[in-house]
Curated annotation (Swiss-Prot):
The species this protein was found in: Arabidopsis thaliana
GO molecular function, one term: aspartic-type endopeptidase activity
Signal peptide: 1-25
Name of the protein described by the UniProt record: Aspartyl protease AED1
Induction: Up-regulated locally and systematically during systemic acquired resistance (SAR) and locally by salicylic acid. The local induction is independent of EDS1 while the systemic induction is EDS1-dependent.
Keyword Secreted: yes
Main location: secreted
InterPro entries in alphabetical order: Aspartic_peptidase_A1, PEPTIDASE_A1, Peptidase_aspartic_dom_sf, TAXi_C, TAXi_N
Length: 464
């Protein structure tokens, strides 16, 4: 009898254990990941109407700024108007074309790209689709301004009063240097003026014409930048633009995070060791991300890949060595991405892949999604699905392998572009031009770390 009771007790314990294990498995399934696929709520693909929820990760370090998507629930620049996907795609393609144009010219000098101080007084096309913004205080007293941050640009600039040429419309009042006690124009004799090659009354004048015909022109200056109340930077070089054109959606200017000497990370090397990181929230979410300077708060789970010797002084290069869709590795050879490799860019929205690589990714994705109703393409995107009447959808995971044995699995929000419930598209595009570009949709929710001094870029999941 004693043996029987012990046996029954063991059976009961085993059942309890199995029940607990299955419950744990269900929890993991509910959280999104199931082996080689994600199951998500269809409603989560579309913008949330709930109020903004700030990310707690942005407040863990003093040198951290809140990042919002320009069209997201947390943006003070957004309106109730419907997101214009056609415009986003058009601007994104303009940015991509400007990147390839700069590469073909092999121009490493952003500031002197426009040699003349005579710029066309006409409406330029937007500076691409840089759609993530931060707010920084400039001057004394500080003037809070919303800036698009961009890893493909070096010089930080903002519109300034007076507008001697023309200025586009922005949400906040323009920065007025005469109202700041810490503003200083940079003299023509300054080493920082060497690249500008233009002067006005002994003051250094900068001119930047972007490849998409947007431009900014004004004085190269130094000013106090306030990141947070406890993190203030003195004598930061920036552009005080008095002649600016482009459709910048209400932002005051641009925060340059590129690899050049005038970028904010390069200027603050002694403070932050030329390290910065960010997490980009999906535009459909009601949460914020972060842009953090320095190594404080970087997760130990970050996996790094070397910054490649890509022949460009204005972008960060990375080497893609593999892509998987679900349980299938794409047949990528060492020559699939040519000698140019790839770049990672915070301002390009959608990832561009070599045409043959994209064709294989699309083929495998279609195979994994064969149980769903396909529909017509949209703009750049030729692989779309109709999810009408569905509560959930299961996507195959998509993972990128980078040099250094670094594997980055994309978040569910980094796979598709939801135009409407009857048209949800694979958010990748093929491109005959090189290099490949790893865009910001595919970077969403990842912690992306740029250790520029260490020559590496890192990734970790659940960054915001």
């Amino acid at each position: 009898m004693s043996i029987m009771r012990n046996f029954l007790s063991m059976i009961i314990m085993l059942c309890v254990c199995l029940n607990w294990c299955f419950a744990e498995g269900a929890e993991k399934s509910d959280s999104g990941k199931v082996l080689d696929s994600y199951t998500i709520q269809v409603s989560s693909l579309f913008p949330s109407s709930s109020s903004c929820v700030p990310s707690s990760k942005a407040s863990n370090t003093k040198s951290s700024l809140r990042v919002v998507h320009m069209h997201g629930a947390c943006s003070h620049l957004s309106s109730d108007a419907r997101v214009d996907h056609d415009e986003i795609i058009r601007r994104d393609q303009a940015r991509v074309e400007s990147i390839y144009s700069k590469l073909s010219k092999n121009s490493a000098n952003e500031v002197s790209e426009a040699k003349s101080t005579e710029l066309p007084a006409k409406s330029g096309i937007t500076l691409g689709s840089g759609n993530y913004i931060v707010t920084i205080g400039i001057g004394t007293p500080k003037h809070d301004l919303s800036l698009v941050f961009d890893t493909g640009s070096d010089l930080t600039w903002t519109q300034c009063e007076p507008c001697l040429g023309s200025c586009y419309s922005q949400k906040e009042p323009k920065f007025n240097p005469s109202s700041s006690s810490t503003y200083q124009n940079v003299s023509c004799s300054s080493p920082m003026c060497e690249d500008a090659e233009s002067c006005s009354a002994s003051n250094c004048v900068y001119s930047i014409v972007y490849g998409d015909k947007s431009f900014t022109q004004g004085f190269l200056a130094k000013e106090k930048f306030t990141l947070t109340n406890s993190d203030v930077l003195e004598d930061v070089y920036f552009g005080c633009g008095e002649n600016n054109q482009g459709l910048f959606d209400g932002v005051a200017g641009l925060l340059g995070l590129g690899p050049g000497k005038l970028s904010l990370p390069a200027q603050t090397t002694t403070t932050y060791n030329n390290i910065f990181s960010y997490c980009l929230p999906s535009f459909t979410s009601n949460s914020t991300g972060h842009l953090t300077f320095g190594s404080a708060g970087i997760s130990e789970s970050v996996k790094f890949t070397p910054i490649s010797s890509f022949p460009s002084a204005f972008n960060y290069g990375i080497d893609i060595i593999g892509i998987s869709v679900g349980d299938k590795e794409l047949a990528i050879t060492p020559n699939s991405f040519s000698t140019e490799g790839a770049i990672i860019d915070s301002g390009t929205v959608f990832t561009r892949l070599p045409t043959k690589v994209y064709a294989e990714l699309r083929s495998v994705f279609k195979e994994k999604m064969s149980s769903y109703k396909s529909t017509s393409g949209y703009g750049l995107f030729d692989t779309c699905y109709d999810f009408t009447g569905l509560d959930t959808v299961t996507y195959p995971t998509i993972a990128f392998s980078f040099a250094g044995s670094t594997v980055v699995e994309l978040d569910g929000s980094g796979i598709s572009l939801p135009i409407k419930i009857s048209q949800v598209c694979l958010a990748f595009a093929g491109n005959d031009d090189l290099p490949a570009i790893f865009g910001n949709v595919q970077q969403t929710t990842l912690d992306v770390v740029y250790d520029v001094a260490g020559g590496r870029v890192g990734f970790a999941p659940n960054g915001c």
